[in-house]
Swiss-Prot record:
Residues 44-66, 209-268 are annotated as: Disordered. It is linked to A chromosomal aberration involving MLF1 is a cause of myelodysplastic syndrome (MDS). Translocation t(3;5)(q25.1;q34) with NPM1/NPM. The modification Phosphoserine is found at S8, S32, S34. Most abundant in testis, ovary, skeletal muscle, heart, kidney and colon. Low expression in spleen, thymus and peripheral blood leukocytes. The keyword GTP-binding does not apply. Interacts with CENPU. Also interacts with NRBP1/MADM, YWHAZ/14-3-3-zeta and HNRPUL2/MANP. NRBP1 recruits a serine kinase which phosphorylates both itself and MLF1. Phosphorylated MLF1 then binds to YWHAZ and is retained in the cytoplasm. Retained in the nucleus by binding to HNRPUL2. Binds to COPS3/CSN3 which is required for suppression of COP1 and activation of p53. GO terms for molecular function: DNA binding; protein domain specific binding. The lineage of its organism: Eukaryota, Metazoa, Chordata, Craniata, Vertebrata. It comes from Homo sapiens. GO terms for cellular component: ciliary basal body; cilium; cytoplasm; nucleus; perinuclear region of cytoplasm. The record marks S16, E17 as: Breakpoint for translocation to form NPM-MLF1. This is Myeloid leukemia factor 1.
Length: 268
């Protein structure tokens, strides 16, 4: 089941290395857990071959074996049905995102939890989100957390057609290492500021309520009453959230190692 759920993550370089390491840890854990019961599990999977050797046992034990085999078959059928459902869902999202003039949102996530004895639980989480808007506008968000290695990382990308600015942050809670890396696709680092402003400008066109706000302003031109003018004079200017966010980002950047890289894409 884990293979089915994270198949879409394995092809993404952001997740692939961590997923492969986590899968190997899971295999070792399952192998160590099944060793004391290995022969019993094999006998369940080979019930017909061992039936002649179990004639001395009572019917109750035979019925229990058949029940176990039936349970495994039912579980396999459930996994198969879920696999087909996930594949169909992924195809539908793929068809939806093809339309450049439509809005779409796609989200995928996977989580595993394991605990053996007195050891602390091991949790692995991975998620990805993609939002699209007309005009080739896209935002991608990816996040991953592995409690076993202590690694946490995230990436946010803003895209306009084949151009993109991606910021990646990672932190290892066990070693204390932190890093920020910027990736520039089909543009130079010097173009990043202008690109970010262009992306924000395009996104604001589709912000809910913007059209109504514009109509309200148009209707109010030349018809403003004295009460509203007095209210505007009393209003105190508030600091822009974007400015405050920028200050927090600068503080974070001072503490982390920031790297930038420009990438040229051959896609058309």
């Amino acid at each position: 089941m884990f293979r089915m759920l994270n198949s879409s993550f394995e092809d993404d370089p952001f997740f692939s290395e961590s997923i492969l390491a986590h899968r190997e840890n899971m295999r070792q854990m399952i192998r160590s857990f099944s060793e004391p019961f290995g022969r019993d599990l094999l006998s369940i999977s080979d019930g017909r071959g061992r039936a002649h050797n179990r004639r001395g046992h009572n019917d109750g034990e035979d019925s229990l074996t058949h029940t176990d085999v039936s349970s495994f078959q039912t579980m396999d059928q459930m996994v198969s049905n879920m696999r087909n459902y996930m594949q169909k869902l992924e195809r539908n999202f793929g068809q939806l995102s093809v339309d450049p003039n439509g809005h779409s949102f796609c989200s995928s996530s996977v989580m595993t939890y394991s605990k053996i004895g007195d050891e602390p639980p091991k949790v692995f989480q991975a998620s990805t989100q993609t939002r699209r808007a007309p005009g080739g506008i896209k935002e991608t968000r990816k996040a991953m957390r592995d409690s076993d290695s202590g690694l946490e990382k995230m990436a946010i990308g803003h895209h306009i057609h084949d151009r993109a600015h991606v910021i990646k942050k990672s932190k290892n809670k066990k070693t204390g290492d932190e890093e920020v890396n910027q990736e520039f696709i089909n543009m130079n680092e010097s173009d990043a500021h202008a690109f970010d402003e262009e992306w924000q400008s395009e996104v604001l066109k589709y912000k809910p309520g913007r059209h109504n706000l514009g109509n309200t302003r148009m209707r109010s031109v030349g018809h403003e009453n004295p009460g509203s003018r007095e209210l505007k004079r009393r209003e105190k200017p508030q600091q822009s959230p974007a400015i405050e966010h920028g200050r927090r980002s600068n503080v974070l950047g001072d503490k982390l190692h920031i790297k930038g890289s420009s990438v040229k894409s051959n896609k058309k």
